């Protein structure tokens, strides 16, 4: 298959909000988790090595909290703990379909909950067919989980970063949810994406994460996680997406 020839080790970036279901008032919808698990089960059988970075926005938004009297640094640390909760939920979902999964945290945390992030150990797990879920963001405030994703992808020497979005199937010149006439890009250079991020105010990725991806030559596929089997399809080139390289 084309996707197998192109990529071996992938980094999947999941937002915390993408795990929630507002209609059902669920912070974590286990049907969504199970759907992701089933897709990864198929991907795993094809020989992919899968690393995951997950956000925590379904539980906590550090930026908004800082406006309500909580110092930004503390708010960000609370957000890092939120990513750990999501990582543990994903781990359980993956194990329920027979996948081996580890959680590594960039924050020092009790070993009964998660392992501390050690680069070589994480690479060893990936090489042995285990899924590694990275929690805690970068472990430092003022950095987004998008930046954590490009950082981990760089350290893990991933071939591609799959940037999962909620209800948006790629990069547009404007917010397609607001502007129906927004134009979608099939492909972009890193510099073009950086220009869009800085000038259009679109929350595709933050500028730090784009710059890091460029410096480490990490390809990015931006796609809609809500589309059925979208993780499988985007790797096969059969899902709407934007490729950045």
UniProtKB/Swiss-Prot annotation:
It comes from the Bacteria. Its EC number is 2.7.4.22. ATP binds at residues 13-16, 57, 61, 166, 172, 175. It catalyses: UMP + ATP = UDP + ADP. Keywords: ATP-binding, Cytoplasm, Kinase, Nucleotide-binding, Pyrimidine biosynthesis, Transferase. Catalyzes the reversible phosphorylation of UMP to UDP. Belongs to the UMP kinase family. This is Uridylate kinase. It comes from Mycoplasma mobile (strain ATCC 43663 / 163K / NCTC 11711) (Mesomycoplasma mobile).
């Amino acid at each position: 298959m084309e996707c197998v020839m192109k990529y071996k080790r992938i980094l999947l970036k999941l937002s915390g909000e993408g795990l929630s279901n507002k209609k059902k008032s669920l912070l974590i919808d286990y049907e969504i988790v199970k759907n992701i698990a089933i897709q990864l089960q198929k991907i795993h059988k094809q020989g992919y090595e899968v690393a995951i970075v997950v956000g925590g926005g379904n539980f906590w938004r550090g930026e908004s909290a800082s406006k309500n009297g909580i110092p930004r640094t503390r708010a960000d640390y609370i957000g890092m703990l939120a990513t750990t909760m999501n990582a543990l939920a994903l781990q359980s979902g993956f194990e329920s379909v027979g996948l081996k999964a580890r959680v590594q945290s960039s924050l020092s945390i009790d070993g009964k909950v998660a392992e501390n992030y050690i680069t070589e150990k994480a690479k060893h797990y990936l090489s042995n067919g285990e899924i590694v879920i990275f929690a805690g963001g970068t472990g430092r405030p003022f950095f987004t989980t998008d930046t954590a994703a490009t950082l981990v992808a760089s350290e893990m020497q991933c071939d591609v970063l799959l940037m999962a979005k909620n209800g948006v199937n790629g990069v547009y010149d404007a917010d397609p949810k607001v502007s129906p006439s927004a134009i979608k890009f099939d492909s972009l250079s890193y510099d073009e994406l950086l220009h869009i991020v800085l000038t259009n105010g679109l929350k595709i990725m933050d500028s730090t994460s784009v710059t890091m991806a460029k410096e480490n030559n990490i390809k990015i596929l931006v796609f809609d996680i809500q589309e059925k089997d979208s993780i499988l399809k985007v790797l096969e080139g059969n899902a709407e997406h934007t490729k950045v390289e």
